[in-house]
Amino acid sequence: MEGGRLGGAAASASAAAAADARGGMSGFAAPQHAIHTNLNNVQPTQVTDFGALAQSAGFRIEDLANLSTNGLFNLKSNAHTIINDPLQFENYVKSISPSNITTTATVTVVDPQTLVPQKGAQLNLVTIRTGNVENWGESTIADTSPRTDTSTDPDTDERNQMFEQGQLAAPTASDSSDRSKDKLDHKTLRRLAQNREAARKSRLRKKAYIQNLESSRLKLTQIEQELQRARQQGIFISTSSDQSHSASGNGALAFDMEYARWLEEHNKHINELRAAVNAHAGDNDLKSTVDSIMAHYNEIFKLKGVAAKADVFHVLSGMWKTPAERCFMWLGGFRSSELLKLLAGQLEPLTEQQLAGIANLQQSSQQAEDALSQGMEALQQSLAETLASGSLGPAGSSGNVANYMGQMAMAMGKLGTLENFLRQADNLRLQTLQQMQRILTTRQSARALLAISDYFSRLRALSSLWLARPRE
């Protein structure tokens, strides 16, 4: 019963307070305007930065809060509220511009008990520092005073929208920064790729330059060796301003170098053949080596043909051979018939058929050599007669000059046949070697090639010993 009486008394008091409030509405219109004016004059430093405070504390502005009647308020979890009197003050609140919001972290609270419904009444403002705020956190205690009410801040939506725009602007700036970084990264990668490509080209140029230097060094070494060999043979190359003589000299020097290279490779083939014969290799292995040596002989005959077109006298005189080899030379090379005589005693035992074949080959080679020798003698005789005719006439006459030019033209035509004689002599040598290979077996052919190589090697050694002999 006593509880019922207390409840009824509380209800009556609440009703009376509401009636008093409604009765005073008409007289409070002017103070509303005054309150609105005072709020406009509030210093920006006293306005609480609700957005920043809520963001730093981890709460949202639109959440609710409870304020006590003494001016201090308790914030619920993630909530801010403003306490209004039961009287309706719809027109006294003015939106606070974000430009006026500072980080002073103060809260201005209107105490509804100080509002007097009289014209020109002043609003009692209570400024509470953030140091006086209590009970931040998870609080579920609500103020049940009949003079308390919860309402949403009028500019909450606007602040939320501005806050969301700020959050959207941050990713945009981040995306712009990322794109800038991506551009820098792409530019850096492109520069690195260009640097790597330039370094690779530089290495290739350096490698090519080194290879050119190495090849030039090898060519210089070969030329020095040829000059040394030419000095040992008593060759003195004279310089001339005549372009044709210079060209022939270059051709002769090139042939000498090619012959030195050929001789070196020939010695390698002979060493391989000698090792195979000493190891008693099979006929198939020996045949491949013999064929390679025969092909190598064919190569030197081709080189001589090219050199004869540049300087036929150089090839015919055997200036690319040692002095001892030149002593036994015939038309720029060896005599086939003489070589077969030397091999007859080296290849025993031979069958009757092989002996007959060697004899016939030797006879035919001798006949061909005699024919070429006779043709060479006839050429020399004709050339001598051409140059000697008309040399007893008076010097300086126009007729003698014309006769002289005619004689030189005839002599030049006859010298052109020297190249033909040289080519026929080389063909005879090559055919003799090929016929000998057909008559002999593979192993006998290998022994014959070794004997020929040893013969010319001894001639070269004899020439070196002769040039190096002590002179009194």
Curated annotation (Swiss-Prot):
Biased composition range(s): Low complexity: 143-153
Biased composition (Basic and acidic residues): 176-187
Chief localization: nucleus
Domain DOG1 residue range list: 252-469
GO biological process, one term: defense response
Keyword terms: DNA-binding, Nucleus, Plant defense, Transcription, Transcription regulation
Region span, Leucine-zipper: 213-227
Region (Disordered): 136-190
Positions of the bZIP domain: 185-229
Signal peptide: none
Gene Ontology annotations for the cellular component aspect, listed alphabetically: nucleus
InterPro entries: bZIP (IPR004827), bZIP_sf (IPR046347), TGA_domain (IPR025422)
Cited CDD domains: bZIP_HBP1b-like (cd14708)
GO molecular-function term, one example from the UniProt record: DNA-binding transcription factor activity
Residue ranges, annotated region (Basic motif): 187-207
Top-level taxon of the source organism: Eukaryota
Locations listed in the record: Nucleus
SMART domains with a match to the protein in the record: BRLZ (SM00338)
Quaternary structure and interacting proteins, as annotated: Isoforms 1 and 2 interact with NPR2/NH2. Isoform 2 interacts with NPR1/NH1 and NPR3/NH3.
Role: Transcriptional regulator involved in defense response.
Family per similarity comment: Belongs to the bZIP family.
Protein name as it appears in the record: Transcription factor TGAL1
Gene: TGAL1
